[in-house]
């Protein structure tokens, strides 16, 4: 079996693109200016770039899974213009309280549970102990910890207002600073 690779798991909204409450129109999608460079660095380092995102708007009926896939296609199109790519997108469409139909469930994939990272690790041959989870909420950091990866908080999106700082391995101003720290941290291995 091939050697396992490491990955940078990233939250989507508020981490690589601007936070809007329930992105449900394509024109709302705006990548942060530093996202392309950050993800290009991940790609160049031979790490997998993986988005893991709670999308309870699906459960709530605000948009469809097909719409979310089209957003992810557009993200890779925008990143591709900058020489970068996301290797995998994993989405939790559920909500335990506000979900409708099959989407109303207490699942294993909704962050801070590690289900999306565990699934990606299986499907993409990722070594979670050598991987990182970057996000703008403490639940993103906790998701990384729950999967055995290092959690990094970015001070964009909801992260701007986070005061508690005892959980992350690092607190970065944005995704680019987070990736620069990751690349330095990997050299310690």
Language-model-detected regions and their locations in the chain:
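Asp-based, Mg2+/Mn2+-dependent phosphohydrolase catalytic module
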Residues: 2-4, 66-69, 73-88, 96-133, ...
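Active-site neighborhood of HAD-like aspartate-dependent phosphohydrolases
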Residues: 2-50
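Active-site flanking residues adjacent to catalytic metal/cofactor-binding acidic residues
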Residues: 10-12, 53, 135-136, 173
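Catalytic P-loop NTPase motifs of RecA-like helicase/translocase cores
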Residues: 16-17, 59, 140-141
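Short glycine-enriched, charge-decorated loop/helix-capping segments at active-site entrances
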Residues: 21-30, 64-66, 103-107
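A short, flexible beta-alpha/helix-coil linker loop
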Residues: 21-23, 56-59, 96-97, 160
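Short beta-strand segments at enzyme active-site cores
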Residues: 48-54, 87-92, 153-154
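A short secondary-structure junction motif
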Residues: 55-68
């Amino acid at each position: 079996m091939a050697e396992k690779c490491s990955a940078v798991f990233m939250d989507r909204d508020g981490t690589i693109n601007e936070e809007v409450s329930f992105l449900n129109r394509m024109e709302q999608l705006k990548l942060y200016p530093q996202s392309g460079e950050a993800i290009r660095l991940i790609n160049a380092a031979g790490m997998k770039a993986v988005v893991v995102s709670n999308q309870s708007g699906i459960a709530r009926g605000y948009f469809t899974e097909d719409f979310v896939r089209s957003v992810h296609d557009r993200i890779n199109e925008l990143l591709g213009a900058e020489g970068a790519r996301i290797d995998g997108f994993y989405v939790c469409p559920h909500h335990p309280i506000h979900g409708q139909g099959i989407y109303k469930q207490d699942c294993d994939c909704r962050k801070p549970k590690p289900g999306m990272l565990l699934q990606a690790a299986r499907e993409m041959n990722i070594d979670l102990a050598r991987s990182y989870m970057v996000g703008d909420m403490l639940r993103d950091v906790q998701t990384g910890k729950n999967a055995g990866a290092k959690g990094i908080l970015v001070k964009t999106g909801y992260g701007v207002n986070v005061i508690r700082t005892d959980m992350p391995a690092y607190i970065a101003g944005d995704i680019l600073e987070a990736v620069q720290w990751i690349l330095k941290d990997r050299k310690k291995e």
